[in-house]
Amino acid sequence: MKRFLFLLLTISLLVMVQIQTGLSGQNDTSQTSSPSASSNISGGIFLFFVANAIIHLFCFS
C-alpha cells in the first residue's frame, strides 16, 4: 500500500509539473515587457525541489 501511494504521488507531481510548464509556455502575448526566461526556470526548479522533498519524506519514513 505504501508503494502504491508513493507511485500515485510521483505520477501526480509529474503531471502537475507538466501542466505548470504548459500553462507558463502558453502566455505568449504581444506585451512589451515580458518576464525573463529565468523566472520560468526558477519556478520549475522550485516545483522540482518540493516534489523531490516530498518523495524523499515518503520514501524514508
Swiss-Prot record:
Location in or out of the cell: Cell membrane
Membrane spanning segments where? Answer: none
**Domain of life the protein comes from:** Eukaryota
Among Pfam families, the record links this protein to: CD52 (PF15116)
Q: Where is a lipid covalently linked (GPI-anchor amidated serine)?
A: S36
Topology relative to the membrane: Lipid-anchor; GPI-anchor
The UniProt keyword set, sorted, is: Cell membrane, Glycoprotein, GPI-anchor, Lipoprotein, Membrane, Signal
**Presence of the UniProt keyword Hydrolase in the record:** no
- Which residues belong to the signal peptide in this entry? 1-24
Which ranges of residues are annotated as propeptide in this record? 37-61
Q: Which GO terms describe its cellular component?
A: extracellular region; membrane; plasma membrane; side of membrane; sperm midpiece
Biological process terms from the Gene Ontology for this record are: positive regulation of cytosolic calcium ion concentration; respiratory burst
User: Which InterPro entries does the annotation name?
Assistant: CAMPATH-1
Q: Where is this chain glycosylated? A: N27, N40
The entry's function note states: May play a role in carrying and orienting carbohydrate, as well as having a more specific role.
Name this polypeptide is given: CAMPATH-1 antigen
Q: Which organism is it from?
A: Homo sapiens
Lineage of the organism: Eukaryota, Metazoa, Chordata, Craniata, Vertebrata
